[in-house]
Amino acid sequence: MSPAGCSHVNSFKVENWRQNLRVIYQCFVWSGTPETRKRKAKSCVCHMCGAHLNRLHSCLYCVYFGCFTKKHIHEHAKNKRHNLAIDLLYGGIYCFMCQDYIYDKDMEQVAKEEQRKAWKLQVFSPALVSPYQYTMTGVGEKYSTWEPTKRELELLQHNPKRRKITTNCTIGLRGLINLGNTCFMNCIVQALTHTPLLRDFFLSDRHKCEMQSPNSCLVCEMSTLFQEFYSGHRSPHIPYRLLHLVWTHARHLAGYEQQDAHEFLIAALDVLHRHCKGDDNGKKANNPNHCNCIIDQIFTGGLQSDVTCQVCHGVSTTIDPFWDISLDLPGSSTPFWPLSPGSDAGVVNGESHVSGTTTLTDCLRRFTRPEHLGSSAKIKCSGCHSYQESTKQLTMKKLPIVACFHLKRFEHSAKLRRKITTYVSFPLELDMMPFMASSKESRMNGQYQQPSDSLHNDNKYSLFAVVNHQGTLESGHYTSFIRQHKDQWFKCDDAIITKASIKDVIDSEGYLLFYHKQFLEYE
């Protein structure tokens, strides 16, 4: 990615542009002293309607403040041909020619420097706090505990009420600004920020960055993102830093074209896994990836592959780690058997449709059924010492805490590119016991018996997030449903969050399904 997010930035970068930008950040965005805060409160009103709210932006070319929501700043940009403005709440730069928030390396550096200065002024200003009360802390750094003063203890006695998180609390719900076809990223961010154990990890400040440049660490950025989500702010967040880091570390996702949400999920988990060095607690890893980072602790499972020789019935077993399970659907070019009773595949308007109901369990049964590899895929059997036909069967050796199921709705081949719109019924609660390697081995040995409650509970999951794709393969949009509390669901459509019913969730098409274990064993 080039240092400049768009070519229109160059028209602003003339003599003294850095100093001019610093003044705007110091006076109107990052207000570090009481004086600058008073100036901001007095000066920052829309020059057209006089409002303080409605996402005020400041023109970068002249002294003009305008509402973004009511498009007063847009009118100014059009009339004066001043194409760049700055968000006075978050500091993001908006280009009216690109019609999007942009990233520029030089301008971002100025913003970070001024934000850091303002933060220091807020923390160490004698007018605000006593110097011994606070220490500057960063993500993953040590911090001193809060020791209340005598005055603060008196105030606490007079104000015994505390803020409680109730079932109606909306902390953690926050929209995300679409930065130009970035709905694929926004829906995954919503799923990750509502993953309970991941939330607990980041909000407890447990990441210790060991990268030479913390500014390039995706885990540090995720820590900041979680703090933003659970800060109580309700205005949409602008994830431009996250987008830039993803583009930097996963270059195949760079650019403003629409990307695949599943591909982004895997790329994000991979980068987070690589950047989690230093977070290992020193204990032996209890997952097939042999890594104790938070990503592998939560998302890594073990997939067992048994290849059985058709002559001597010898079995060769391998176990591979996985972060997700991709499932074929009826209507794809891959044969799908068995379908639920009454199913009938067909093609309508170039897209695949199936009558009847296909369930997630159907897809999992197909995924774990024995598959004959055929004469063209003979393997050398270690028992027969010769090439023989064989069967292959996949089962779950170890289940992850969070199981992500990818319904393969996009089919790409030399002759065909299409979206499969088959409706797949998925449950709110899922029992993975029938698909475990241990269940298969017990059945083969004729020793299958009902598992104990503790073992059975270990394989039970609850749905907590669903990612959907609306539209066609060429033109579509991603949204997500997330569970905030038990049986309380919300639809996340970029910056817009709306309440949803359970029926809305289970009636949706489904592209990525996120399930969380109902019972956890703590080591």
Swiss-Prot record:
- So what does this thing catalyse? Thiol-dependent hydrolysis of ester, thioester, amide, peptide and isopeptide bonds formed by the C-terminal Gly of ubiquitin (a 76-residue protein attached to proteins as an intracellular targeting signal)
Which segments constitute the USP domain?
Answer: 174-518
This entry's Gene Ontology molecular function terms read: cysteine-type deubiquitinase activity; zinc ion binding
Its annotated compartments are: Nucleus
What positions does the entry give for Zn(2+) 2 binding? Answer: 46, 49, 67, 72
| An annotated GO BP | chromatin organization
Where along the chain is Zn(2+) 3 bound?
Answer: 59, 62, 76, 82
What PANTHER family does its record include? UBIQUITIN CARBOXYL-TERMINAL HYDROLASE, UBIQUITIN CARBOXYL-TERMINAL HYDROLASE 22
Q: What family classification does the UniProt entry report for this protein?
A: Belongs to the peptidase C19 family. UBP8 subfamily.
- This chain belongs to which protein, by name? Ubiquitin carboxyl-terminal hydrolase 22-B
Q: Which organism is it from?
A: Xenopus laevis
The opening ranks of the lineage are: Eukaryota, Metazoa, Chordata, Craniata, Vertebrata
